[in-house]
Amino acid sequence: MSQLKGQNLIESVNQHQLKDVPFFKPGDTVKVFIKIDEGNRKRVQIFEGLVIKRQGRLVTETFTVRKIFAGVGIELTFPVHSPTNEKIEVVRRGIVRRAKLHYVRNLSSKASRIKEQR
């Protein structure tokens, strides 16, 4: 490891921190299982919603998930390779023509439905 310098050193450190995650893209509906520490106990919370965007690469890659709860839109951004993500599960695959789905924010819940990939 001491022989590596510069960009090679950065890439080798990044490779050790990458997690094995399933393939998903904007338009897919995913479940994100998040580890939460509450004082002396630990639990897993599930956040299910539509992937609006995915950006970055390697260790710094993030994705944003949107869901509607009690009539209010909630968006959370997660690092893909975070240790707090227990797992990411793809519920269904959607067909979209954009990489960033910010237009979904302005649509009603019925109009914001995404076609499902067969």
UniProtKB/Swiss-Prot annotation:
One Pfam family recorded for the sequence: Ribosomal_L19
GO biological process: translation
Cellular component per GO, a single term: cytosolic large ribosomal subunit
Keyword Disulfide bond part of the UniProt annotation: no
SUPFAM superfamilies tied to this protein: Translation proteins SH3-like domain (SSF50104)
The keyword Ribosomal protein belongs to this UniProt entry's keyword annotation: yes
Keyword set, alphabetical order: Ribonucleoprotein, Ribosomal protein
GO molecular function, one term: structural constituent of ribosome
Family: Belongs to the bacterial ribosomal protein bL19 family.
UniProt function note: This protein is located at the 30S-50S ribosomal subunit interface and may play a role in the structure and function of the aminoacyl-tRNA binding site.
Name of protein: Large ribosomal subunit protein bL19
